[in-house]
Amino acid sequence: MDEVSPTKHFTSKPLLPTKTPRDKAISHYVNALNSPRNVVKTEIPECGIQIIDGDGNFASTDTRERPSLKNYILSKPEFLKRGMDYNAVGILGAQSSGKSTLLNYLFNTKFRILNEVMGRSRTTHGVWMALSGKESNIVVFDLEGTDGSAREDDYSFERKTSLFSLSVCSVLMVNLWSHDVGRFQASNMSLLKTVFELNLQLFVKEETPKTLIVFVIRDREADTPFDQIERDIMEDIMRIWDSVIPPEKFINSPINRFFDFQFTSLPHYEHFYENFVEEVNLMKKKFDPKNKETYFLPQYNKEIPADGLSCFCEQIWETIKDNKDLDLPSQREMLSRYRCTEISNQIYKEFNDSIKGEMKTLKKGNIIEEFKKIMTKEIDTAIEKYKEVTERYMESIVEEIEEQLKKQLYGLVESLFERQAELMEKAIGKRVKGEFTIIRNEYALLYNKKEFNPMKYQKYSQELSRTKAVIERDWRKQFDESVPKFLAEKTKEKFNSVCKDIGIAYEDAVSKMAEVMKQHFGDYLESTIKPKITPYLEACKKDMWKNIRNVINTQFTNGFNKLEEGFKTCSNMNKDTIEEEIKKSKIDILNIIKELVIKRKTELPYLLERKFNNIFRFDNKGLPRKWEPTDDVDTLYFTARDETEDILDMYCYFRIEENDDQFKFTINYRDGDLPSESIEALPEGADEDKIILNHQERKELIETLNEFFEKGYLIALREKENSEIKYQIPLYLIVLVIFFGFDEFIAILTNPLLFILTLIIGGGIYIGYKLNLGGVAKNYIQYLLSMSLSSTMEYLRTIPFFTPLIDKIWPKDDNKDDDSTEETQEETK
């Protein structure tokens, strides 16, 4: 087979003087992983690091001799920045064939080399790794030599290391001596067969990138043409390939589907040292990605991210070591999942740390301005950082973990927003209450009982509407500035809930203002009506309720038109609600008037007695009536009583409507005693709520009035009888008095002292007569005589001699004496 010459050259990305966003993200991630908590400080050996020891143990932890592979890579930030922009090269060959020496010359590594003085035992144990190049863009693997005496016939380890190198290396060098070409074992052809078989295993589930196998012929002999050596090796390769039993999927597949081959040779290291060094330097150029003839073509790159190399190598080796089927796609997926998860966790932690300031702000009860902008920026930064660091991993896994990371970040931000929303809701509620209260306090100053103008309330109604609109606008703005896009749907209910609360507070404020306006109107109307109806209540005339109704109707017509206008302009009430409120207000005002009437119940006995006296005991001029024998006491008495009862009847019922005048609550006394059922009975059709005097109160008042009426009537009859006696003195008696008393009359006239005394006594009697005080004088004289007689008898009763006689003619009766005395005193009054 002809030599495979490179058709493309692979150009690595140059390091720029300024860091790209991806470089910054990786640097940030590296710094986080290099923190004292994540890195164990172990001295980095100059000879590279043994990643797999001779017993097959992977360098997963730090030891005294070497760091773990992870920490070794983390100590190379330049390499970490490469992402997938690096190449891996490994070398296979017999033990002590100069593999490590060749690598040191090619890549400026410092792998330990053979010291022949110490013997030709194996120098490289297991697998060693080092970074090469000024930009650390080449990973060099030095594998333990094959066919060593230490392993004897145990080929399992070299098989495992070969499979490991195939999994991670873009270029695999096979180091063999020229004089071993043609020998199956010595030329590592048996190892090549293993490589071919293992590589087919790697291709079973998914085609992996090709591997370039470079045969390095050592100790070239001048008399053997190199082309012949190349043909011999290719013939051996084809025989080996034909002997390999491929999976069914790859039957009849050519070898160049899986491998590319190149050949080179070097002179003897010791005999032709200068030539060896010169040709090695020429060969070194082919390991420069910038060279057009480079070995590192893109199709050979295994696409393992630099920051995931340690994890990938460990997973690959553990799988190989456990003799499990190696599934590179699964391993890459596992690596991607592991690294993406690790990066995701680190970014989540950084995100959590970055918003601690906002957490403290919210914890203190302070709202974060532009919450949405801040959180969106933090989330975008975190996701961008995640994408930058994970861009070389499997896209499906990166996207899957990215979604998980977003959910974590969104969950954290959502918990912060819940607190933010709680504080905003509390603040907006406080603002609504405060501003509406200020407006309410302002229109409360309008209160004046003597004046009611609903137009003044309209200003504050408009102010409430304007304030509500401003608060709703500010709430929407604040909410929009606080709600991240991913929470928009979830928070609609919260937004609408607060808007609803604002509306409820506004309706409550309007309702309270309408209530204040209604109360203002009620007080105004009360203060207007009271002075106008009080005189009617005091006058106690038959047309009292008619006059009161006229006042109420007049005031209601004017007043409630104003109130209705106020409701229309200052509230959001509809027509039916306004009518209902007007109706309630009328009822309230009528109840106030009713209470005013009820309060006068205490004065009712005085008003009724005054009414009776004004008709019965005083004449039309308001002077005390002088009863003459011709006066009709009975007719006047019944007239006074009936009119007094009419007044009582007016106060029994709240006659605010015209048809209320038909109800009667008192009865005529002329038919005898008052039956109790006539008082307790409620007139048919009467409204119990309009009752002012209940049946018990009416009963007590009627009984009291009955006594008052009877006393007045008896006094009038007595005075009339006295006047009749005065007019019944016979004429002959007057003539006899003059005839027999003529001498005494002359004696009085001739005696100045008796004359003056007679004038005084006569004048007093005349005045008493003119003033109709005869009855009073009579009663008083009777009272004095009675008291004198009673005192005399009681005194004689104390003398034992007269006691029996006095007891017979003057029995002792204290109650009678008291009653007669009381009656005499009453008549005297």
From Swiss-Prot:
- Which annotated residues bind GTP? G93, A94, Q95, S96, S97, G98, K99, S100
Bilayer-crossing regions: 729-749, 753-773
Keywords noted in UniProt: Coiled coil, Endoplasmic reticulum, GTP-binding, Hydrolase, Membrane, Nucleotide-binding, Transmembrane, Transmembrane helix
Chief location bin: endoplasmic reticulum
Origin organism is Entamoeba dispar (strain ATCC PRA-260 / SAW760)
Q: Cytoplasmic side: which ranges? A: 1-728, 774-829
SUPFAM superfamilies in alphabetical order: P-loop containing nucleoside triphosphate hydrolases
Mind telling me which PANTHER family this protein's record contains?
Answer: PROTEIN SEY1
Per UniProt, what is the membrane topology? Multi-pass membrane protein
Outline what the protein does: Probable GTP-binding protein that may be involved in cell development.
Question: One of this protein's GO BP terms?
Answer: endoplasmic reticulum membrane fusion
Q: Coiled coil located at which positions? A: 372-396, 576-596
Residue ranges of domain GB1/RHD3-type G in the record:
83-305
Family, per the entry?
Belongs to the TRAFAC class dynamin-like GTPase superfamily. GB1/RHD3 GTPase family. RHD3 subfamily.
| Name recorded for this polypeptide | Protein SEY1 homolog 2
The cellular location(s) given in this protein's UniProt record come to: Endoplasmic reticulum membrane
GO CC, alphabetical? endoplasmic reticulum membrane
Q: Which residues lie on this side of the membrane: Lumenal?
A: 750-752
Write the Enzyme Commission number(s) for this entry.
3.6.5.-
Q: Which GO terms describe its molecular function?
A: GTP binding; GTPase activity
Outline the segment boundaries, as ranges, of region: Disordered: 1-21
